Amino acid sequence: MALNTLINNNSWDILPKWIEYNDEHYKFLSRELINVVFPILRETDKQLLLDSIILVINMIHFKFGFGSIDKPDELLWHQLIQNNLLDSRAILNAMLPYINDNAKDDKKHRLRNLEDLYLEKDDRGQYVYTNSQYNRCIRRLETDGKISVFNRPCIREYFLDHLEILLMSIETSANKLYVNWVDVLPVKMSDFDTLDIYKQTVVKLNSYKSSSNQNSNQSNQESNESNQEPNESNQEINQESNRNTFNRIDLINNYIDPNSGLSYQDIYNTISNHLFHEIKNYKWLIYDIVIAEKPVSYLKYLENKFDFDELLEGRMWSQLDKSQTIRFQNQWNSFLNSSDTNDNTVLHHFYFFFSKYHKNSQKLIRQNKLVLNKDPDDEEDIEENVRITPETTQDARRGMSQVPIEEIYLFFSDQLTSFKKTWYFYTIQINKKEYVDSEDNIIITPKNIYNYCKSLVSYTNASGKFTQIPKYWYSLKPEFIEMILIRILDINDPIKNDWTKNNWFNINNYIRKFYPDTKEEDLPVMNYKLHSLIRNNIVDIIFESLIFHGILSNFKPNLTITDNSYIRASIGSTDDNKRTKFKHQQMAKQYFTGKTRTEYETNAYYYLTGQTYDQLKPLRNKTYHNFEKKYFDFLTSEQIWTFTYAMNWVSQLNFYHHYSNNRVLYITGATGVGKSTQVPKLLMYSQKMLDYNSNGKIICTQPRVPPTVENADTISRELGVPIRAYNKLYDKSVFTSNFYVQYKHQKEEHIDRQADYFLRIVTDGTLLEEMIGSPFLTRSIEDPYAVDNLGNQLDWVKTYSTGNVYDIVIVDEAHEHNANMDMILTLARDSIYVNNSTKLVIVSATMDDDEPIYRRYYRRINDNRTYPLSAFIDYNQLDRANMDRRIHISPPGATTQYVIRDFYLTDEESALINEKNFIDYGIKKTIELANSTTNGDILLFMTGQADIHKSIKAINAATPPNIVALGYYSELSEETKELIVKIHQTLASYTRYKEDVELDESEITRRVPKGTYTRAIIIATNVAEASITLKNLKYVVDTGYNKVVVYDPIDGVYDTWTLPISFSSAMQRRGRVGRLSSGDFYALYSLNKVINNKTAYKIADINIKDTMVKLIKSYPNDPFIISPMNDINQISNLVSIVNKRLTNNYVPEDLIYDILNNPRPYYDIINKQYLYIPDLTDISQYYTYYGKSSDIVLDEFDPNKINLSDYLRTNHDDYHFQQNHGAFYSRCYTGYDNYILEDQSLTFYIIHPDENIINRNLYTGQMDSLKIASSIKESYYYYLLKVNNIQEKSDLQRINFRNFQLIKYPLAMSEAELQMLIMNVPAKKSDLVIRYTNIVDSNINSYTEEYYSGLPNVNINDMTRVKSLLLINLGQIQSAVSLNILNNYNNILWYSYAIPYQLNHDVLAIMVMIDLASDINQWIDPSKSRCCLNKFLNQHFNKEGDIKFLWDLWKKIQPILIKNNLLNTNDINYLRSDFNRNKEKYLSEKKIPFNEFLLFDKLFNSGKLNTTDEFYYYVNGINFDFVMENNNVSRMIEILSENELLNKDKIIDFVSQYLSLNFTIYKQMWSHQYEIENKLNENSDNNKDIVEWVDKNLRFPNIITHPYNMPDDWDKILETYIRALSTNVVKNQGSYYLKMNNGVKIFPSRWSRFNPTEKTFLNNKSEFIIYHSNDSTDNKVNIMYLTPVQLKWILDANPIYYYYLIFDKNNIINKLKETDNIKEILQTISSVKPYYSIKSLIEYVDRMNNPTISRLIRSEIYGLDNSTKN
């Protein structure tokens, strides 16, 4: 049959027209919408907008089923015009790029034509309407390397392209909106067959079956009865088919269904995804077996063999009692050893699916507990029909006999848990229908439905291979669309649907087995009968599945909750709280009362849980009646999420439209609309509704801990699956077993790593670590066949496969630009570019500064190549570049959910306030507000703790007694932070006097009565900009300043600056009000003062060394994983595919290698995500569409002189620019190549480490000029110019910045190199070769060789940086011990150097002391008088320095800990008795210590209790938080503190933290060893005994020696300290110090203004001193913790560092501005040269056991002056 012979491919004219041309509605929209919003727009553009919005509204009207008795036209019309045409304006906005306008539409009022949307700028050079030009501009690379930019107008074709895609999105989302319980309600299982949409679907699917059309009101039963029964012969079947008369099938653009009822899209997607793909991995449960001559599913059969009640209830192994576990063990043994034929048949398939799909199968194989007798990757369908023999049974028994019983139970549990998400579970277990239908001894089983659906979505290709077509409707090519319609509608076709022979639905093997009397010649007849019975039920099955999955909903406008005029008239008020209460009352009255409520509870299914709403457990809270509240009662009381604009029906449509068509989304929105809480919900729902993905995984980053926890709590509670619930036994909230929402930060987590559908909210550092290890966010395994040129195995080479770690990455609060965030956004671009099934969602309160950056940076991500692949846009030549990636979730024109009144100063008033007096002005304004208003809390923004302390004192002294001022900053305890966050609850019970609010609890001696305070003033740093929502907040006072800490890589110190805030920060502070009610914002500055202030990028403010050394690759011969040659998205490769297809010039078996040379690293991703049908030998399946393009090449024209209309219509510029100039290079296997990380071309980082000193071209990203930043010192600029050979700043105006060298990264890497963390090694081209021993095809081998030979040329003398072996192993130690304190490389070096001496725990103690008291004077007892200071100093002065003081202190504390058995916890096995005792009590529901209860409850809820590894999980879960009680330890510490004049509280803090960290180390090392011994890790890197390496390679000869004594422990501590901190050396100049590596002048810090002596215990300063840390205040550098050293010690301790410092002419100090200090240091360096020992250097590098660095050093020292060779 010729293509499309049955399809009428119509235009949009066929769509039913509710609003007709020039009718009253049409005129109204023209007059009141288009002409009002765009009054001066060109008439042709107005007409375009009007016609388009009419088309969209008609589509909505038709697709959502308006025009019926239940949903009359007037209902939709009222919805469109209520609230000042709010929804109509929202639809209009959805058709256009995002326009940042106000409520009055002032910008739109000025628009004259649509072309100007992209073009018009304001006086500041910013685009008036949209920033789309930044990702749409035309670019051309000039000969000088500069990129020229030409503006692209917004032409009509772009608008129409987007309109077509929008209409498709409406069809895709129709009748499936998120249930908001306002105007979107779930369709109930009990009455779906009464709905018009059901009846229309029945008619549609049967309208082609018979010439006598059936009445649309007939039920499915009636339509079935009206169909003629097929005759019993092939001839009669043929005659019956030929009698059918057909109409051609109408479609719009070959994909969109203009017929009533469920769309063909929904029908196909449900069949393909819900009924076939979703069940594939568990389908053995619906296999049929013959029992009493009838088919019985394996599930029902096994229910007779096992007690499935616990499994079906979702109870895990850990939740069974002993009798239940014994019973299950006995049942399994009986089943495993049974001689029953049916048992053996089921066992065979159980074994096969267990081997293939059990989550722990690989671990069991490594442990030799699961024995494989065949490859589980075999196709299951072959296995289904394998003949069961004694041999196969014996294989299965042998394979499973050693598998632990809990693993058997776990597999059953996992399989049933996933199976419970499917329609098959619903029909068998809930609907209690073992058979779907039966007639004349023919039974339709669930397995028959599966086979029908599988057959429907499969075909036999030209090679005779049975092949599955794409899963999604819009991924089907037109020929498959026709094939599917022929099958679904059962249209006779001699090729595609002929029932006289074996047809597409062919289950002959099944028929032979279950209908053995059927003759071979009658098989077509029997197939037809089965098919007909299935078709009679398929509509019901589809509806049941959509309802069961919780995605079929009914949008029915409800003016009583959405019409503001109606609400205002009903309540007689505009009060926000009264409005919310009225809405709650309406919801309760209409939906949640009486029978209506019962129907929704018992017959509506929740998409999240797959259960009815009555199965949601009540929310538990101490404040609820009887501590419980049912979910529907919660919805009608305390929540407001259902009313947020994010849940508005038009907002939802717009969201799903963007989600479906974009891989990167930029989401902004008004304050309180639900950006942080509702967007994640919509994404979770989109995965199920749009992606049909029941196992979607979303991760969302937050910049700080409070919003991480609060958002997880809020979202989970709003979803009805709270992560915490009140526990009456402990009178506290505890974690629940709900893991749909999870969270994690450094100190706490609520995570189930086995969960398959979740939203995980984490602090951004957590995700960054994961992304470093998972470059494409997919699964990866080591490639065992990868070798180098010499045949050595390369265990770091991997292959990357489908199966995402996360499907969606959300970066929330992105405007804050902390370093982790921007690195995530950087790494995410490469991940998403390669892995087209992942999405990046950037959520920000404001995007004014960032949007141009995002648009430029993510241009490379081509939305046309999103998975699922879209044949729809390919066939219709639509380009997703023509739709905007930005979504603004707000009512049109609104900036906040509630009204905010702004009060800015005039420019004259603003000029009076500066960094010296803003504190006083802030205090004054706050006092004025507090005294002039009567209710509502106040939030005052200050810059730091000192400001806050001053403000609290002043404000509390000058405000009424019912108002209390409290501080909020990051250093506060978690308890105090929680008090502030929940101040609306805690204020009434707050009883401190105002004067006492900052005292420690132990110092409180008096109290005010409860209820004294009714208002709070929160004085906060910028940490409150995004981390808290204060429910009673009415006023914000913003001083407009912030403290910024900036790292100076020249001086090597952090400087603190007080600077004006950015505009985005100002908007964030403003956004603290207007979230839950209206409020006022008082800015102590004019708008003009901040509007141009740009965000300070944290990555440019920090020391990037530690981050960069993690990112850099480990081996010089590690090549790019993906380069232009093997990039499936590279346009030249796509063009090559098209050419090969046209010329037929290829060998199918070699095709993918012929195209990409080396696709091996991501072969699986290419096969499954870049082909319509996974078959790399079939060139017709390659998805080559990348967007509109033609033969017109931009370079042929001068855009300023010619008409580019043809080019603009047919090309999106990125395609040609990328092909020629935008080549993609991914990271390497072990990290990034050095030149990519250095990024001198400014193309890798979204925010460059040197971003704060450069001005960029926003269109191209290229550097335009140097920026002078107030927070950057002159010395940095001097060095920068020196490196670039620029003598004067005036020369900058004449240089080409294309070749300008930025220095922050090179400086960081130089520092890392001196610490031997990285190496500079020769990068030889011949090294970049990987061979694969399992590739025997010579052609394929030649292609891979061609790939590696074609990588960018590296000259023989070129150098590249890689991780040192030391760094690689230090990373292993960091991973093993998992302590934040060791994330600093100085600390991990010190700790590691101490391991060979077994002093690492002593070193940890000293580290903790320094961490707790960064300023040494914090060790002094603060209660002692001034005169005691001298006594204290005299007592602790020593000649060996401050580290010696800490060592001595530790040696006095340690005996106390030993004497009181506080170090016994280090013996992990000692915990077994506690574990066993508390486990027994927990399972008996007896009270145990609360922390133990939390741990056991977590193990119980996650299924880890009562398992083989339960003690391992227990140990891993312990967080040892030592709390000092009033006991013997406390008394001994008190005596010690008194005797030593020490700060007792500081000692107690130290003991608590040390014991916690020390235990953590023992715990982690024990776990690491356990994992090795029990083979729990797949990654061989994790199976390495890292301690053995350290002990062997970091044991150096002593540098501190004594003539008569062996070095003692202090000597070893000192030696390890010098080795780790040898870069921190200063030369003592008497009254000041000079840093040895850069000549920075450092003045001694003083104990106090009363004691001007230097702040150190060192009383015998030597010429050279090591300091531990430094800071900078008021541009003065201070150093802390001083240790005297000898010159020889430091030269021998780190000979590499001092080799480069002394001999390297490119050292930084040689390029600094020559001052007296620099001269002094250079002279010092020259003077120490004779003392430097090259011999020691060689011995040192040899001992490090790193041949590469040994060769390098030997090579470099060749030719040095002989005087140094001693």
From Swiss-Prot:
UniProt binding sites for ATP: G669, A670, T671, G672, V673, G674, K675, S676
Span of domain Helicase ATP-binding: 656-865
UniProt EC number: 3.6.4.13
Family per similarity comment: Belongs to the DEAD box helicase family. DEAH subfamily.
Protein name as it appears in the record: Putative ATP-dependent RNA helicase R366
Catalytic activity: ATP + H2O = ADP + phosphate + H(+)
SMART domains: DEXDc, HELICc
UniProtKB keywords: ATP-binding, Helicase, Hydrolase, Nucleotide-binding
Superkingdom in the source lineage: Viruses
UniProt GO molecular function: ATP binding; ATP hydrolysis activity; RNA binding; RNA helicase activity
Position of sequence motif DEAH box: 812-815
Record-linked CDD domains: SF2_C_RHA (cd18791)
Regions crossing the membrane: none
Pfam family name, one: Helicase_C
Keyword ATP-binding found: yes
Every Helicase C-terminal domain range: 947-1116
Compositional bias segments (type: Low complexity): 210-239
Keyword Cell inner membrane set for record: no
Location of region: Disordered: 209-239
PROSITE patterns: HELICASE_ATP_BIND_1, HELICASE_CTER
Gene3D superfamilies named among the record's database cross-references: P-loop containing nucleotide triphosphate hydrolases
